[in-house]
């Protein structure tokens, strides 16, 4: 037999086709295959490399390559098996020699066996070296997959390549790994996207307590429910993870990662402070890179790796733009390719495998880029929007665009752009011109296929992932998201399918969350809409089958397009990865609870990294440039005004109910902790983790004798079956403040209370904290919470039952425990209150004791079952009624007749417990409110039942202070809360009926007086009718006798020439001012007024004309009307060049309505316009006084009309309101006499055309365009009447349409700016 040679040089290549089968039962291939099969059996998720037996690699579900460390026993077993294979081959070789000597085996066969023996020798040698290195280094490095040659890469690593593409310029690159020692810092291959941590940095995501249970999207508790989450952060963009479980909210303070399946857990905060708003954030849409999130930071682009710790989560920082980045989009086929666009008109394509420079760039050279999107079908096509143009680019075509789509003839801005998922050449655009256009650039780039025209500019428009439709999001004027069916655009046009209403401010982003994508032959996907609004709320909207069917969704057909999210592992990145060395997997349940650190605890440990800034994409070693305070990137220290504590986070979550679930009972552990956290203000929640079902609370509890307090810290662990069958585990920390006997008493009492709550399937934390806070004794808790309704059915008394449940224990508090500490830590509730509404109604509530009749009525109602109560959410509307559909079951006094339809007072009484005395509650009706009709007059705001689909329209029960009723209470108390709505119309001088029919202006003032006299007589106000008739005759006489050509233009009021007219006007104004009748004062101001007079000096500003009056004239008039600042007064001069300083008077405190505490007119103030003596010899002096008198009276007229216009707005009379405000617009001077001034918000002074106030030296804000709402720099167009300003281009665009809407001012003030004098000013 030949000597076995271990040198590789002695090896010969085996023959390719002259292999003779060996008769031995064990050959080389069989032994090696057996070794591989055993390795596969022991490690089913691992792969064995036959070329290198000491190397293994692991493939997870997402296609990523994971690390796998060889254990000692694995190496020993491998060496033993290899030795066995070698021995078998040696025996085979001996047999081969014998056969060769007998000339039965050929020479070639012997050489083949020798080569195989050499291979076995080499295999054992490599395994022994690996084991020796493993023992010497004491597991100092991680052994990972190692590919030596390109051939081995293709053979062994084909399955773990990034992805494969069809002839794309962004082809896949094979991943190479280095088996050499890894340093202590985090290292990565420049050509790889796989992080290779060292042994001491074995990172993993923290799992929940039930990590051994497979959790999927169909196990989600929030997918089928409406959910509202309040996030008090300046969030600029939102994105969704590939699996649909997490959302990323990007703000100026960093990145928030929120788990939608565990919304009660505070989000993970990756801090990065920046002074710039985040324009966009995008989660990687591919399953292979589900840990990547990209966001903008001015001209930079940040790529976050959520699989890394928070202090090193920034993996890449892309810097290629010179202006702010406006949009980003991941490639739809390649997970490593990203496209970004910027205001600098450039579009960059980045390959994150070499992120130093963009791999491709496109430029428009004229307009900045606002949107960029990759094609869903073609991996080489992408589109970008520049102004009103859409450029279609091909990365194989060069720098010139493939197609250019001109979306509009006018100057506009494209806000949204998206390709169709099913057709390669179709896309849609939405723009500021209030249109949504559908394009097919293969057919035409000039005319769209279809067009949708809306009432307001469209901020975003996208195709729906189901059916054939679009979903639109307005930019302003509407806080809803609209869904349209687009199947019959040619014949019927778009059909509105649904309106998602509920946000109170503009919606900024919407996303689609789906599940059920793993079925290929049918489309069984479920959908949920996620929206983010400027009201700081994330809301989830389930999509029902009725909406899917109305959009043409067919579940029997397969999905018509490729799903990039398919195969994504359903996991969350809402928790920071923890190092393996910090996790103790062998601790028991109590130790695990004590050693558990919440997400906020981990965040506090990283607060030192707030100002660290970015770290280079590949160079992660620490240097002086990475130290706090020495960052080379722009950061800003911020201080949150509302710290996001766990309790504050819980308060902002509202989850819908399924079916007829009770709103007074928490539906899960998160709601229970949220409710009790708001009810008990003296309890401090140190740690809350709903996912791990633990919390830690502390408080000063009155558990010591003689009313003594002791500090208590309580750890609570809630099992999964709580509160159905499992009791929470309490761990009370011992303290020197109380002895062991007192400690045992408190602990046993808490356990007994929780056991009794669980026996009734009730939540127990409310009862436990009521006992610890001293609000209720154990006896009271038992009587209120666990006493049966039918008490006489048992022979035992409640005291006997209590003694059986709670054995005799010493009372360590001393005194009467039921009285000494009851409610001592809770402030007294408000038992009565009253407030005026804007519709002439007074709403008040108060508490009364129940009499016998009321008690009888309560008993009658209890026969029908206790009604569920919830707090009304809206403002009282006079047109709505809250009469229950089953009102026959109740007394007549329980119906609420609104004062808007009747002059009589209305009253509502309902039985609630005493702790709810500060809330206004109403019984639920049997009908629900449609989301589309929530603002209509037919929708009943109060007394309507909100189901699971209507939680955004309602508020859950009051949760402030102690107003929440105890969860334990099942019996109504003996107090009644009365809510009364009183109509005050007969006590107020202003009359709504008159305002509805009064005529403000018809051109002839005599006709106005006669018509108003008829209206007053019609409603039986005969005194007012006489006043109007008298005033009409007086003005008619003046118009006949006075020659208008001889009237001095500076005398604004022609009735000044008549002593009788002056006396009559003076008497009327004096009388109605004393009566506080703003209605008559405003109407008289309209009738007695004429267009504004000419000014004496062309250089005098509008403010000087109105308010620079001689002091003696003001004193002679003898009245100062202190009008409160109303909304109308603020809106009169909005977007104007000249601000009226007199109208910006101080706002009174607590002026919540028109009739506030500070009266519109002082009771002692009178308007006495003293007559002037025209017999004086100095006529010039008299004329000067008349001019001053006229200007001061104009000021009063403006204030009266503005106040009355505010009242008309509250009544809903918008046309008379605009007619009233037009008179105020006429009071300004003509455009030729205007000078450009700014108004300082700090000192209320007017300045010249400068940015710095000349009086207080504060920054004066620039004027904004009424069309695009952007600040104005340079030339602008100024209207001579309403004083609104617009950019020159915006002015041309607005008035170029030629429709009826664009003929008036773009601000909506009603001014016909196009036909008035327009002036060109420079700002």
Curated annotation (Swiss-Prot):
Compositional bias per record (Basic and acidic residues), positions renumbered to this chain: 1-11, 27-40
PROSITE patterns in the record: RWD (PS50908), WD_REPEATS_2 (PS50082), WD_REPEATS_REGION (PS50294)
Pfam families: WD40 (PF00400), zf-RING_16 (PF17120)
SMART domains, per database record: RWD, WD40
Top-level taxon in the UniProt lineage: Eukaryota
Region (Disordered): 1-57, 79-112, 879-904
Zinc finger (RING-type): 1265-1309
Family as reported in the entry's similarity comment: Belongs to the WD repeat WDR59 family.
Name of the protein: Uncharacterized RWD, RING finger and WD repeat-containing protein C11E3.05
Lineage: Eukaryota, Fungi, Dikarya, Ascomycota, Taphrinomycotina
């Amino acid at each position: 037999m030949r000597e076995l040679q271990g040198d590789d040089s002695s090896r010969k290549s085996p023959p390719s086709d002259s292999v003779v089968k060996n008769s031995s039962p064990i050959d080389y291939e069989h032994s090696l295959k057996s070794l591989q099969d055993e390795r596969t059996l022991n490690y089913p998720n691992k792969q064995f490399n036959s070329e290198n037996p000491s190397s293994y690699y692991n493939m997870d579900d997402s296609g990523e390559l994971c690390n796998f460390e060889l254990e000692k026993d694995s190496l020993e077993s491998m060496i033993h098996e290899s030795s066995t294979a070698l021995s078998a081959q040696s025996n085979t070789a001996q047999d081969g020699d014998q056969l060769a000597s007998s000339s039965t085996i050929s020479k070639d066969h012997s050489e083949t066996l020798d080569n195989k023996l050499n291979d076995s020798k080499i295999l054992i040698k490599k395994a022994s070296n690996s084991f020796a290195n493993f023992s010497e280094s004491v597991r100092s490095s991680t052994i990972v997959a190692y590919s030596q040659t390109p051939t081995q890469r293709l053979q062994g690593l084909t399955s773990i390549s990034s992805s494969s593409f069809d002839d794309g310029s962004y082809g896949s690159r094979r991943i190479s790994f280095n088996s050499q020692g890894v340093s202590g810092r985090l290292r990565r291959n420049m050509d790889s996207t796989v992080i290779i941590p060292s042994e001491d940095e074995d990172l993993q995501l923290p799992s929940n307590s039930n990590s051994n249970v497979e959790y999927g999207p169909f196990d989600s508790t929030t997918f089928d429910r409406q959910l509202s989450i309040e996030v008090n952060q300046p969030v600029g963009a939102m994105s969704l993870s590939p699996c649909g479980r997490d959302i990323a909210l990007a703000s100026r303070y960093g990145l928030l990662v929120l788990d939608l399946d565990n919304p009660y857990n505070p989000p993970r905060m990756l801090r990065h402070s920046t002074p710039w708003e985040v324009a966009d954030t995008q989660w990687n849409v591919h399953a292979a890179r589900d840990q990547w999130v990209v966001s903008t930071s001015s001209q930079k682009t940040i790529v976050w790796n959520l699989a890394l710790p928070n202090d090193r989560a920034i993996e890449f920082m892309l810097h290629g733009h010179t202006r702010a980045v406006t949009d980003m989009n991941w490639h739809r086929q390649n997970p490593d390719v990203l496209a970004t666009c910027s205001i600098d008109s450039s579009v960059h394509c980045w390959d994150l495998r070499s992120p130093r420079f963009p791999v491709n760039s496109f430029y428009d050279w004229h307009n900045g880029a606002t949107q960029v999107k990759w094609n869903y079908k073609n991996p080489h096509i992408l589109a970008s929007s520049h102004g009103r143009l859409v450029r279609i680019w091909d990365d194989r075509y060069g720098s010139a665009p493939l197609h250019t789509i001109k979306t509009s003839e006018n100057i506009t801005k494209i806000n949204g752009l998206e390709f169709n998922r099913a057709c390669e050449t179709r896309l849609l655009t939405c723009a500021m011109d209030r249109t949504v256009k559908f394009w097919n650039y293969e057919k035409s780039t000039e005319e769209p296929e279809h067009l949708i025209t809306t009432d307001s500019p469209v901020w975003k428009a996208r195709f729906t992932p189901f059916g054939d439709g679009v979903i639109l999001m307005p930019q302003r004027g509407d806080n809803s998201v609209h869904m349209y069916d687009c199947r019959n655009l040619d014949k019927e046009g778009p059909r509105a399918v649904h309106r998602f209403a509920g946000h109170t401010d503009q919606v900024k982003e919407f996303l689609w969350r789906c599940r059920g994508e793993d079925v290929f032959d049918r489309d069984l996907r479920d959908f949920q809409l996620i929206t983010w609004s400027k009201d700081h709320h994330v809301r989830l909207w389930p999509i029902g089958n009725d909406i899917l069917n109305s959009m043409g969704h067919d579940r029997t057909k397969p999905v018509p397009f490729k799903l990039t999210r398919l195969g994504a592992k359903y996991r969350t990145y809402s928790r920071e990865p923890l190092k393996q060395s910090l996790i103790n997997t062998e601790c028991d349940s109590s130790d695990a609870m004590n050693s558990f650190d919440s997400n906020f605890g981990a965040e506090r440990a990283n607060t030192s990294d707030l100002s660290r800034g970015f770290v280079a994409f590949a160079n992660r070693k620490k240097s002086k440039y990475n130290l706090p305070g020495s960052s080379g990137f722009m950061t800003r220290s911020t201080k949150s005004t509302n710290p996001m504590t766990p309790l504050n986070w819980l308060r902002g979550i509202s989850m819908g109910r399924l079916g007829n679930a009770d709103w007074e009972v928490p539906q899960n552990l998160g709601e229970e902790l949220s409710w009790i956290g708001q009810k008990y203000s003296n309890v401090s929640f140190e740690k809350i983790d709903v996912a791990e079902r633990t919390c830690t609370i502390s408080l000063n509890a009155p558990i010591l004798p003689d009313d003594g307090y002791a500090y208590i810290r309580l750890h609570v662990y809630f099992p999964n079956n709580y509160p159905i069958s499992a009791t929470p585990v309490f761990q009370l920390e011992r303290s020197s403040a109380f002895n062991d006997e007192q400690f045992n008493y408190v602990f046993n009492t808490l356990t007994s209370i929780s056991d009794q709550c669980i026996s009734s399937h009730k939540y127990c934390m409310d009862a436990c904290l009521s006992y610890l806070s001293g609000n209720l004794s154990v006896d009271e808790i038992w009587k209120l919470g666990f006493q049966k309704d039918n008490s006489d059915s048992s022979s035992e008394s409640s005291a006997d039952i209590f003694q059986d449940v709670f054995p005799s224990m010493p009372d360590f508090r001393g005194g009467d425990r039921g009285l000494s500490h009851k409610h001592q830590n809770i402030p007294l509730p408000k038992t009565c209150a009253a407030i005026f509404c804007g519709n002439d109604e007074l709403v008040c509530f108060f508490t009364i004791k129940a009499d016998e009749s009321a008690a009888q009525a309560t008993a009658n109602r209890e026969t029908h079952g206790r009604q569920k109560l919830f707090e009304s959410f809206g403002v009282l509307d006079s047109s709505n009624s809250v009469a229950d559909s089953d009102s026959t079951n109740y007394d007549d006094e329980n119906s609420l007749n609104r004062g808007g339809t009747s002059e009589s007072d209305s009253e509502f009484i309902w039985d609630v417990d005493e702790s709810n005395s500060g809330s206004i509650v109403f019984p639920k009706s049997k009908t629900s409110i449609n989301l589309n009709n929530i603002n209509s007059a037919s929708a009943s705001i109060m007394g309507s039942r909100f189901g699971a689909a209507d939680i955004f329209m309602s508020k859950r029960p009051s949760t402030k202070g102690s107003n929440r009723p105890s969860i334990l209470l099942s019996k109504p108390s003996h107090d009644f809360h009365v809510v009364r709505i009183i109509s005050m119309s007969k006590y107020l001088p202003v009359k709504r009926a008159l305002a509805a029919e009064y005529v403000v202006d018809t051109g002839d003032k005599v006709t106005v007086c006669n018509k108003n006299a008829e209206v007053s007589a019609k409603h039986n106000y005969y005194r007012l009718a006489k006043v109007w008739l008298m005033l009409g005759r007086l003005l008619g006489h003046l118009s006949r006798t006075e020659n208008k050509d001889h009237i001095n233009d500076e005398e604004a009021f022609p009735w000044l020439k008549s002593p009788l007219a002056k006396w009559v006007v003076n008497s009327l104004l004096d009388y109605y001012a004393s009566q506080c009748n703003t209605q008559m004062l405003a109407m008289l101001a309209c009738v007695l007024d004429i267009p504004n007079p000419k000014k004496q000096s062309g250089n005098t500003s509008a403010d000087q004309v109105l308010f620079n009056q001689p002091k003696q004239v003001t004193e002679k008039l003898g009245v100062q009307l202190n009008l409160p600042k109303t909304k109308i007064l603020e809106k009169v001069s909005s977007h104007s060049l000249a601000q009226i300083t007199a109208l910006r008077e101080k706002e009174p405190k607590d002026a919540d309505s028109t009739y506030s505490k500070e009266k519109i007119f002082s009771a002692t103030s009178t308007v006495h316009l003293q007559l002037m003596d025209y017999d004086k010899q100095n006529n010039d002096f008299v004329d000067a006084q008349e001019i001053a008198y006229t200007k001061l009276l104009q000021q009063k007229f403006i204030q009266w009309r503005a106040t009355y216009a505010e009242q008309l707005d509250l009544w809903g009379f918008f046309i008379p309101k605009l007619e009233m405000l037009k008179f105020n617009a006429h009071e300004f001077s003509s455009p030729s006499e205007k000078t450009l001034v700014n108004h300082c918000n700090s000192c209320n002074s007017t300045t010249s055309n400068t940015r710095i106030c000349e009086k207080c030296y504060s920054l004066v804000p620039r004027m904004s365009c009424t069309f695009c709402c952007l600040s104005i720099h340079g030339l602008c167009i100024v209207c001579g009447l309403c004083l609104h300003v617009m950019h020159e281009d915006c002015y041309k665009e607005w008035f170029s349409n030629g429709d009826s809407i664009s003929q008036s001012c773009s601000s909506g003030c009603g001014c016909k700016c196009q036909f008035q004098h327009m002036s060109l000013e420079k700002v």
